[in-house]
Amino acid sequence: MQYFAGSLSALSLILVVDLPTDQRSAMFKQLFFGAGVLLMVQSARLRWMLLDRYRLLRSFVVGVLISVPLALLISPREALAIGMLGSLVVDVCLVCRAAWRIDETQTKQFFSALREGPDHLVERTIGLNLLGFGIISLCVSDLGPHVYVSVLPRDLRVLVFFFSVLLIWMALHHGFAVHYASLYFKRKSQTSDSSAESIFEFPGGHSPVFFDFVYVAYTVGMTFEMSDVGARTTEVRKIVVVQSLLAFLYTTIAISAFISLFTL
């Protein structure tokens, strides 16, 4: 596909050479304008997918659209739990899709131009995910033997709780992945020395894509440590420690909740 696109571009340039100067200039302006618009559209799409304030707004809209109609059929708590699960599914799928598809150039352009405060990114990521875990815990707190009026079977409610906890865990680490990528390219853009130390040392020496930062976040979340990617600055080591502690705390609470569910 890239070979075909390159051949088509070369053929277009050959054909343009034979055009008059004014027509050739107008055509180049259209090409550059179209490329600029395309970059703006791609940047806006990535912001909508990855930044937490847009993720929160999107999740709220999806949750309301699912919960309100369901509240007419089942209990409000059950409707809220299913609505939150639906919003988490949409959010995680969009972030994973972006991580899987964007390349080195798109990653560098997007995160280099990002003007998000690193501290605010971490605070919002932690706050929103703890809030989400609290809401889903409240929604399924009726799984014990003394249940009020419930429409859904207990096994289905346990399933909703399980997948919600899993997706909240993924959303937590997606937020840290965005933070790591933002911090990495921010430090890169602040120094003019190409040999200056970066916050991460990726094996292979290639320019990282967003998926590499998702990999780092998942690795810290699952093993509570760095693996083959090295943390090279004190600043990023502090963030890794915070993420490890949060992941450990979250995992401990989730395991305790699951054990209590199956022993009721």
Regions found by a protein language model. Give the residues of each.
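Short, hydrophobic transmembrane alpha-helix segments
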Residues: 18-22, 68-81
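The first (N-terminal) embedded transmembrane alpha-helix
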Residues: 5-11, 51-70
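Pore domain of cation channels
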Residues: 212-219, 227-264
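Juxtamembrane helix-capping/reentrant segments at transmembrane boundaries
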Residues: 108-127
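Alpha-helical transmembrane segments
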Residues: 75-91, 157-172
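Hydrophobic alpha-helical transmembrane segments of multi-pass integral membrane proteins
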Residues: 9, 61-63, 122-139, 215-219, ...
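Membrane-proximal soluble regions of multi-pass membrane proteins
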Residues: 184-186, 190-229
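Transmembrane alpha-helix/helix-exit interface in multi-pass inner-membrane proteins
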Residues: 166-189
